[in-house]
């Protein structure tokens, strides 16, 4: 739906927006099929070196512009000899009361958050009370749609200079963690329709945050070593390191369909690779084997692509209708409940 909507919003028109969706579905299937009989998905990466066009330019700009030191300069400052968050409209951080800060910090001990961290893996490290000492806690506000209505915090760890590049040693190597409450997924509404489903689901994931972290680790090749779970105030929170290279690509930069299509191909290949990496079932066949078999014939791929494009177009129209309805209701204060 997003691919179709961005195409329409950028003036491509219905035909080219539908073509972009078909480009996605075709590339997705071909990418999955290319992984049958090999493990190439494990080494796939999207970098400036492996990309082209505007996406490559964007990745190069982010890499050159951002750094761990610059991130700490933006979000933190040294107060009375200790680093702390800057709470302002610019950082979108707000102060929390002392009791809440203490409860959050308590959740980040060895037997809490520490127990959920990987023991072996990329950049994984043994627990160190000094390194994982919580220096400050702030509430994150005004973030994306996925964060509305859920608790979200930034937690500042003391860290060490060894964790950053030489150019950033003066920053002290502090680590910023993004901590967000994880609500139940849509599938939770149907879990339990069959006897034993709820118990099976609970045996896989002790809480929803553990489910989200397991998914993140399965989908990425260089899994975030700080990805884990923190439980406080009766809720389970997903913990991730805030990447210094966090940025959003501006889709309005595309001037032609060809540029947009190349971007869609890159997104489709990335999505397909993540799905292949994250497959759970190994027998009787893996995800890539099932997809390859289901879409072996060209007519099957074409039928699926056209169906996805139709759903995307209908979904967009429904969202527009829903928004217009909500906007009209919001503008008519007399219709609001007393």
Predicted feature descriptions by range:
Residues 1-54, 58-61, 122-331, 338:
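Conserved ATP-binding subdomain of kinase catalytic cores across diverse folds
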């Amino acid at each position: 739906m997003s691919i179709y909507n961005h195409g329409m919003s950028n003036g491509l028109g219905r035909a080219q927006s539908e073509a972009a969706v078909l480009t996605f579905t075709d590339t997705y299937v071909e990418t999955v099929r290319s992984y049958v009989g090999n493990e190439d998905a494990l080494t796939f990466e999207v970098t400036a070196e492996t990309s082209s066009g505007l996406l490559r330019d964007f990745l190069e700009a982010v890499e050159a512009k951002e750094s761990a030191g610059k991130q700490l300069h933006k979000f933190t400052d040294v107060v009375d000899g200790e680093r702390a968050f800057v709470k302002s409209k610019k950082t979108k951080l707000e102060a929390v009361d002392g009791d809440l800060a203490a409860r959050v910090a308590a959740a980040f001990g060895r037997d809490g958050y520490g127990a959920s961290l990987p023991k072996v893996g990329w950049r994984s490290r043994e627990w160190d009370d000094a390194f994982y000492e919580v220096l400050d806690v702030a509430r994150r506000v005004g973030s994306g749609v996925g964060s509305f209505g859920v608790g979200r915090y930034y937690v500042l760890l003391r860290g060490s200079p060894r964790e950053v590049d030489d150019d950033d040693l003066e920053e002290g190597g502090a680590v910023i963690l993004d901590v967000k409450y994880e609500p139940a997924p849509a599938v939770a509404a149907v879990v339990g329709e069959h006897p034993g489903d709820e118990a099976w689901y609970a045996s896989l994931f002790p809480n929803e945050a553990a489910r989200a972290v397991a998914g993140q680790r399965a989908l990425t090749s260089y899994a975030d070593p700080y990805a884990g779970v923190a439980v406080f105030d009766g809720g389970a929170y997903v913990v991730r390191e805030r990447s210094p290279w966090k940025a959003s690509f501006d889709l309005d930069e595309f001037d032609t369909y060809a540029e947009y299509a190349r971007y869609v191909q890159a997104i489709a290949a990335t999505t397909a690779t993540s799905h292949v990496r994250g497959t759970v079932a190994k027998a009787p066949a893996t995800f890539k084997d099932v997809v390859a078999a289901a879409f072996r014939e060209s007519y099957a791929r074409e039928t699926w692509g056209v169906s996805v494009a139709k759903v995307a177009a209908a979904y967009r129209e429904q969202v527009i209708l829903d928004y217009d309805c909500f906007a009209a209701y919001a503008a008519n204060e007399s219709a609001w409940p007393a």
